[in-house]
């Protein structure tokens, strides 16, 4: 009985948020489909992607989906999400194993965020302000992921992940500015 309850709970955790997102998207698009028809709505969508603002926003939304899926839905349940809160700072594991791919992965995962964020929202201004806004946005998105992982017991909460993710976002913005 307990096993069945855990299975039902796990199914809800894995499917509730994607289901809510899917339902929201369908309900948001429904009035347009009813008014213009499916074919005209699809044509209008692809036509809107010719506008750079729409294209970059579309790519940013795809990026958000991929990162959220990878960090929240593709993880196993963790019984102790707070087991290594202050771990993960070392860039090198040992002299024999080389680089820690988790650190590089965290930086690389947020690099597109910084680039797409600046292309979408800060394209007109290439300045320190752009870097600060991207830093804050990267920090907030990374903290959202880590806190959500903690709430739903997905992976382990680590401050180093937030720092390295934020660094990746800032590096993406630096490439935009250069």
Feature map (PLM): residue ranges:
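Bulky hydrophobic segments
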Residues: 1-154, 159, 173-178
């Amino acid at each position: 009985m307990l096993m069945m309850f855990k299975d039902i709970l796990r199914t809800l955790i894995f499917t509730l948020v994607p289901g809510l997102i899917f339902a929201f998207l369908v309900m948001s698009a429904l009035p347009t489909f009813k008014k213009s028809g499916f074919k005209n709505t699809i044509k209008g969508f692809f036509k809107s992607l010719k506008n750079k603002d729409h294209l970059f926003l579309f790519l940013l939304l795809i990026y958000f989906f991929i990162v959220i899926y990878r960090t929240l839905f593709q993880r196993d349940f963790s019984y102790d999400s707070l087991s290594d809160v202050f771990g993960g700072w070392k860039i090198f594991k040992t002299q024999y194993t080389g680089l820690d791919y988790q650190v590089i992965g965290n930086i690389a995962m947020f690099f597109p965020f910084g680039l797409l964020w600046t292309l979408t929202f800060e394209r007109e201004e290439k300045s320190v302000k752009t870097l600060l806004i991207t830093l804050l946005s990267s920090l907030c998105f990374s903290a959202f992921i880590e806190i959500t992982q903690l709430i739903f017991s997905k992976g382990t909460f680590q401050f180093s992940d937030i720092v390295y993710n934020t660094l990746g976002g800032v590096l993406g913005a630096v490439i935009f500015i250069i």
